[in-house]
Amino acid sequence: MYYGRKIRLARGVQIHDGAMLNYRSGRGPYSINLTIGDGSKVMPGARLIPQQGYIKIGKNCTIQYGALLYGVGGLEIGDDCRIAAYTVITPMNHVFEDPVIPIREQGETAVGIKIGRDVWIGANAKILDGVVIGDGAVIGAGSVVTRDLPPLSIAVGTPARVIGKRGSRMRESVPNCLGSEIKRTRLT
């Protein structure tokens, strides 16, 4: 399927009521600045805003309620990804080096973000510009990803740090928010 000059939806894509696909802001050189692959779902309240860049979402992905995805520097999401509610992915950043000049007047940088296939991003996570997330990675809820993550890594925290690898046994105890410990035996 093809919608307008800036948006392309593949077969079986589900765009739920209340989701926003903003293609009007795309004034950049990209002929198509929003592409969503076969079988992917965009849930109510999710917003996809390419701006002057592009957003490319692979096959069988789910973008959950209230997620906010920008495309200024380019955003590529591989097949079979799960992006949980209220996640923010922003491939741009403000320049703030000069304390004399207001931040709004210093411009922006935009490198782009690449997310591999079969990645799960937990609720309220933030993914910042310039990051590459490897295939099969898992990002914990509320984490802020500021640097690249290797394939199959499990990352949590602010800033996110790798605490394990999918498919390997974790024998350590991980403190939970109440101060007690949770025993981890197998993460798959």
Q: Where does each model-flagged region fall?
A:
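Double-stranded beta-helix
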Residues: 164, 170-171
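Mobile, glycine-enriched helix-loop/loop "lid" segments at the mouths of ligand-binding/catalytic clefts
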Residues: 90, 97-99, 171-181
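C-terminal/domain-terminus segments
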Residues: 132-156, 160, 173
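Flexible, glycine/small-residue-enriched loop-and-beta-strand segment within the central core
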Residues: 4, 14-127, 158, 166-167
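Membrane-proximal basic amphipathic "stem/tether" segments
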Residues: 1-5, 174-188
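Non-catalytic C-terminal accessory region of glycerolipid acyltransferases
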Residues: 154-156, 163, 178-180
